[in-house]
């Protein structure tokens, strides 16, 4: 009887996870490593390669906090300054764990993107495709089952996933640029159910749209507003905010800048982010406070994130006030 009850409870938990957690990972610092947001951003940088990693710890007040980690790598395969076009390749991996069952996912995707400059190159269009494999699963080591007949259809599920994206960059003047992009992931909506009780446990299509701009003022300062929206199944998230950046030294040999900003997740959380850009490195930290109905349960403790990005530059040319992301 105890085994049967345990089985029912565990099946219920898994059914809940299948429905509620059939979502992709997301970060408050969602554009620190933009490859996680849109495959078209692969190669969208003024360097030959870029590497990044982000770690998120959420709900530290509970016994088993939610943890998410991601890493990315991108490289320019070919670039033509004459035709202002080229190909880029990228790879991203992620892992997250949640709850006492350590229910989580691991995903790895390969990306290829193509960009084309328009006119004098102040406008750039990029498209990207991605394909990969994911695995979701849980750990039953902490569950005691006295009835050997109790079992689950599978504790781990491996599935393929496909995605595509498009991005546009526009340099309006020497002091102003904007970039926008949209992507669709899980186009194939793979089945990730563990039990027969899950009526609809597909990883739903994930739509993202994103915009970022920078306006340079007072020579050494920049204002960077940002907005992002994503929808997956019944889950919606609207993020908006702005950073202020101080460019201390823009010589590549001594490059140094500091930034700070506020990010809001509509009706959910507010976050403060800090970053240091030094030579080819970017170090970032973000802390958010829970403002949703879960604030009481979490003691308003939201999450913190840390991230690092490293770029390999092709030469030591002086960076322009507003950098073209590719040339």
Regions found by a protein language model. Name each.
Residues 23-327:
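Subset of outer-membrane beta-barrel
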Residues 2, 9-19:
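Short, basic, low-complexity termini and linkers enriched in Ser/Thr/Gly/Pro
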Residues 1-6, 22-26:
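A generic N-terminal leader/anchor concept
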